Amino acid sequence: KAATRMFKVSLPKLRAYVKEVVAMETPVWSDQFRIAGRFDLLCINKHGRLCLLDFKNSRRAKTVDQIQNYRQQLGFYTQMIKETLGKTVEDQTIFMVTREGFVQQFQFKPEDTPRSELVAIRKHFWEIHHV
């Protein structure tokens, strides 16, 4: 129900931003980081670049500083897409819809999340969870 509402509210912005769908809800993994997941959308955006797009719900509007964990998540997905599909993500976008129906769009580049940051996050996770 929430996903349907989020999609309907963000549809006008999505239509303007997405030019071609490459893949949706596709499972990917990284042997290097020993993680797996399923991304929301891989597309060609209005700039003609391969873009990883993620949908998020939020109770209220957020600032870019409040969504750094989502930026990091996109970094891991970008790595998994490269390893699994052999595709190089050029842009990363988050569409966030608030309870009131406000749609926020956050833009990142893969280089915004350096590899060293991903390695540190994964190492920290391993230490906490003993994996």
Positions of PLM-derived features:
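Mg2+/Mn2+-dependent nuclease catalytic core
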Residues: 26-130
